Design a protein with these regions (language model features):
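Active-site neighborhoods of divalent-metal-dependent phosphate/nucleic-acid chemistry enzymes
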Residues: 59, 70-116
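Alpha-helix capping/helix-boundary segments
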Residues: 8, 43, 82, 102, ...
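Short, well-structured N-terminal submotif of metal-dependent ribonuclease cores
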Residues: 1-39, 53-67, 109, 119, ...
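Short acidic-hydrophobic, aromatic-tinged amphipathic segments that line or gate anion-handling sites
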Residues: 76-77, 128-130
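Phosphate/NTP-binding elements of NTP-utilizing enzymes
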Residues: 47
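Phosphate-binding/catalytic loops
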Residues: 87-89, 124, 129
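ABC-type ATPase nucleotide-binding domain
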Residues: 50
Length: 130
């Protein structure tokens, strides 16, 4: 199983060419597994917030989009372990609460994170694929 950052979910939904070859290959490999692709529960909130702010355009209702995503991926709950782990992340890791929950979730679940976020990748705190 691999964990997807929020922007990766958006890019997958839009068939974006922005995904790296390495990310595409990892996603294709993970899709072959029953427990292949996961997102954090906070990703659903991030997507809802982006829609509310008009930063993403929806062709269906927000609730329908979120339900589609929920059906497409394993949604990891925001666990107590992940919340506690956010406080142990070093200063080099992004301060954004969603980034911290996603990164901490990857760490406590032992998952690699697919992300284009340079700040996350540069921190080398979480194993990333890009």
């Amino acid at each position: 199983m691999i964990l997807l950052d929020t922007h990766v979910v958006l890019w997958l939904k839009s068939d974006s060419a922005r995904l790296s070859r390495k990310a595409k290959a990892a996603i294709e490999d993970a899709r072959k597994e029953a427990d292949g692709l996961a997102i954090s529960g906070i990703t659903l909130l991030e997507l809802a917030t982006l829609a509310k702010k008009g930063r993403i355009q929806l062709s269906i209702s927000l609730e329908s989009m979120l339900q589609e995503i929920e059906a497409q991926f394993i949604v990891l709950p925001i666990s107590a372990r992940a919340c506690a782990r956010t406080l142990q992340l070093p200063a080099s890791y992004p301060e954004d609460p969603a980034d911290r929950i996603i990164g901490a979730s990857a760490l406590v679940e032992g998952l690699a994170l697919i992300t284009a976020d340079q700040e996350i990748r540069r921190s080398k705190v979480v194993p990333t694929i890009w």
